[in-house]
Amino acid sequence: MSEYILGGWAQSLADTPPAGFSHTMYGMVTNLAGLTTGTETAPGWSPTNNKAPKIPGNDVLWTYGGGLCSPESMPKTSQQISDIVAAAKDNDWAGVDFDDECNMNIDNLIDTMQQLKPLQTSYTFIAGWAYNNPTASSNGQAINDAVKKISNAGAADRFALMCYATEMWSKADIEANVSQAIERTINDNGVAAKSVILALTPEGLDDWNLNYFLDQVLKYDIGGLYVWNFPLLKGADLNVIKARLGI
């Protein structure tokens, strides 16, 4: 059995992960007020009334948040916290991944994570230039503060570092930010190396950037690798990942 986690996200409950995955996350529950995918006016599926797909060998979580999630500063009330916890516990989910792309309420997020125990939780965030240069922007400082606060509280099992945009970053951006984000998370923000997960996207993935990311997983001996939108991952790339991580 590998010492590394391989997992990822999909947007349809019908998408099943490839062999070798151990963690699968479904979402994105971007309508935070209604706890559905989609938007408040055009909602999709909800973890409140969908059982977790049963996938042998996988811990199956749902993702609260994601790109274009709204409103900001969620969850705001004790009822909203209770609704998140109930959705996970009542429907056989292994836990909840919190993808913070809309300035979530970190104190309430920590409360939610603690109430979810013994289920699993992860905190997912964009680990790019702003994160690596916190003095240059209020957003960068806020991300660092959030990671450190959640880590100090012992609330999240894993921290997933999104080091991509709509596609993989340029070579220059990757070299300037990926290893730096890992080091910042561990050394400055107090996250245990094995709780750090590096995340990539199949869009724009090539031999160089895939192996660069895998190099960092191995160099820092972190927790593993997550793949955004894993149905798009090519079989050849999956084989490289599994071979290099010993899966």
Predicted features, each with a name:
Residues 2-185, 189-211, 215-220, 231-245:
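Chitinase-like catalytic core of GlcNAc-active glycosidases
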